[in-house]
Amino acid sequence: MSPSPKIDHDDVLRARAKLLATTGPTRREEVEAYRVLAQVNPATHLPRLVNALLSLSYDHGLRDSHPLRLALCEEAVAAARAIDPGTPDREKLLFRALLMCHRELYALGRRAEGLAVLADMVAIERSWGELSGVPAVSALHLWATALAEEGRHAEAADALAEWVAAIRPLRPDFDTLARSLAEWAATLADAGRTDEALSAFEVLVDLDAGEATADRGPLACHFYALVRYAELLDGCGHAERAAAARQSALAALTELATTGERKVQSGDQAPFWAILLSWSAADGERLASDGPCPPSGAGPRQWSAEARQRYFDRLATLREQVNTLAEDPDRHLPELLRLHRMLTVRSAVQCEHRTYAFAAQLPELQPLFDEGVELARRLDAHDPAAGSRTLAEVLIDRSTFRTAACRFDAALGDFREALGLRGEDH
């Protein structure tokens, strides 16, 4: 940002008068004033111009004007880059301006440009880490999520590996670390790196077990993790290890049904359940999508607005498709079950996402899980060879839902029936 070749001193006086007015300048007046003053004294006024531009971009009147907000953010980025490199907080101002620019680019659907901005942010934080010796990785997590939405799973997995390695020495809270490990494992699996995914998820299972044993974390979360771990092992052909994981899950659920949680827990069990449930259905979701997909293992609050909207907008279409096939269910049972599970999983994720009062959403979700079990029983009656495995899977889905709803006895009944269908009820 180069100074104007000619400075109008009347403009400078008016700019200073605006800033010193007793009523105070509006945000727009502040921007106009600092645009002028930054030409006179860039060292002092360029940082103030950056802050003023970003403040104006927050203005309520511009809430739905993403092109205008983007223009302000881009001007803020240019102003921040023009600040002398030796100025304190220059990089922090630039990082903040880039973050706002990234958000507006994504809001306008300009995802490739948004990714490029994120790459700049990651580079800035890496330079901070090299100078301070303390990793700065907030942009790295955003970068990984964005890469995963574009299907660039190998790059996303590498970014998440760096993220997890950076935050673990900082001793993050249990929920943050558990979700980070789940997201990393899911992204590794999406990248086809199944052995690494299993190793990452084993760390999560061990972490959950330790937290539950020490009464620091919910036993329900350990149950969900064991269920998902067994599914991963099955997918990799490790049938005996998968069966052993389900026996451990049975022991955890039996304790919950007998004594309940060992201590009163926070409301963070349902989000973890919803994350693992959506991950288990992610393969089918990707096959049905032709745009940005939600990253496996990440909650909807981490997704981009576009990915979130696409995911939830399909609920109405799924319901119509399910209702159409349900008019003659016996002709379409396998496809009906597949679509019904997609509908159930998306509905569960939506209910958990839109409110922290998850218990209030249970009446809406219960019929979906019950319908899924009834459809699977019909398939089992028509085709026991294929139906028993499907019924076991749907019963386990409902068991995890009932656990999230703190209906532990009913959850245990479902889980035991599922193990019986799999021949694992010994």
Model features per residue range: what roles?
Residues M1-R16, T22-T26, L250-A251, L256-A257, ...:
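C-terminal non-catalytic interaction modules
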Residues M1-V40, L46, N51, L56, ...:
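N-terminal alpha-helical interaction modules that lie
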Residues L13-A21, N51-S65, L93-G109, P135-G151, ...:
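Tandem amphipathic alpha-helical repeat scaffolds
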Residues L20-R35, G61-A82, Y106-I124, A148-A166, ...:
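Helix-turn-helix repeat elements of alpha-solenoid scaffolds
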Residues Y34-L46, A78-K92, A123-V134, A165-D175, ...:
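Flexible helix-coil transition and linker loops at the boundaries of alpha-helical arrays
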Residues T44, L49-N51, K92-R96, P135-S138, ...:
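Residue register of alpha-helical TPR repeats
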Residues A52, D59, A79, A97, ...:
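TPR/TPR-like alpha-solenoid repeats
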Residues R228, L232, T259-G260, P329-P363, ...:
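Long alpha-helical repeat scaffolds
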